[in-house]
Amino acid sequence: MTAGLPAWRRFAWVLGLLVAAGCSRGSGAVTPKPIEERLLKIGNAYRNAVRRLGHAPKDFQELKPSLEGDATEDLLRSPNDGETLVVIWGVDYDRLPPRPDNPYVVAAYEKKGLGGKRYVLRFPLGVKAMTDEQWKKAVFPPGYTPPP
């Protein structure tokens, strides 16, 4: 179909196809769940608060100035189970000694979760949906014991 076209027109035609394919709805982009967005917002604010304060925030009041937009305590409620999220306050996650077996440390989590999984904020910054089995193996900050 493009064999009789000059090289620049073939290039433009192929480029047009690639652009159209990249802009389609089926591009594979994943929309984060509200709980994931909420936990990431808390995680980013927590890290910013450590920089701003010079120490890890000890409670929501110290975290609040580092939050963008609406900074109400409703941010700490899980949209999945309706429970208050558990935030492990007072830990500077960037200063914890590295663990070669598992570099991720739990920083906040849903109390119950939904459908056999609870969403967990971990540092280095990320969110993971954990089964009960994964929860039992999760790494927590030194001195913190999670509920069963």
Where are these regions (language model features)?
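Small-molecule pocket liners
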Residues: Y46, Y104, R118-Y119
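Short, hydrophobic/aromatic-rich segments at coil-to-beta transitions
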Residues: D101-A107
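Short secondary-structure boundary/capping segments
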Residues: L96-P98, Y119
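Short, well-ordered junction/capping motifs at the entry into regular secondary structure
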Residues: E110-K111
